[in-house]
A protein has these predicted regions:
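A conserved structural/catalytic subdomain of Rossmann-like adenosyl-cofactor enzymes
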Residues: 1-173
Length: 174
């Protein structure tokens, strides 16, 4: 039948790690295998020892047909009540109404002012190295084999969304 799990994480797993790094490869595997169903942003200051923003990642290895190839993002960051007295860094709790609104939004799987739905390809990118030739007196420096040497001081990188064709991207952006 399949399994669905929810994991509470900070923001780092969403964006850390260059393409090919461990973090990036884990994220890539989850998305390529169509297991990321939803990410819910939570209010900050929900936990005792930190005020950081947190997120619930919902993973599902048996998505319904309408959810296949898609990721639902829900902004639940405004659904909280302030505590009368802070408990360490914890100064908020998710309100009952907020929990119900998040759950209903998740179940409905429709875009709204707090819900966005994207194709999986929206979340991946290819990291491309952009080189410029090393020049001496305005002439490109080459190796003994005749290859142009790159100027490492001018090296740059482009993060190209998987949904874009690399050649089209460079024509349009670089």
């Amino acid at each position: 039948k399949g399994s669905r799990i929810g994991i509470v994480l900070n923001g780092s797993p969403m964006f850390t790690g260059d393409g090919g790094s461990g973090e990036s490869e884990i994220r890539k595997w989850i998305i390529e295998n169509d297991m990321l169903e939803c990410i819910v942003s939570l209010p900050n200051s929900l936990f005792f020892n930190t005020g950081i923003s947190t997120y619930i990642w919902i993973l599902n290895n048996n998505k319904t047909e309408e959810r296949q190839g898609k990721v639902q993002l829900i902004n639940g960051s405004n659904f909280f009540n302030k505590l009368r007295k802070n408990l360490g860094d914890k100064s908020k709790e998710i309100s009952k109404e907020g929990r119900n609104k998040i759950i209903d939004t998740y179940k409905q799987f429709k875009e709204s002012d707090i819900c966005y739905i994207f194709n999986n390809s929206h979340f991946g990118y290819t990291k491309v190295t952009v080189e410029q030739p090393l020049e001496k007196d305005g002439i490109a420096v080459t190796t003994k084999q005749g290859k142009v040497k790159p100027d490492t001081k001018k090296r740059d990188y482009e993060r190209i969304p998987l949904s874009d064709d690399i050649e089209d991207y460079f024509e349009r952006e670089v």
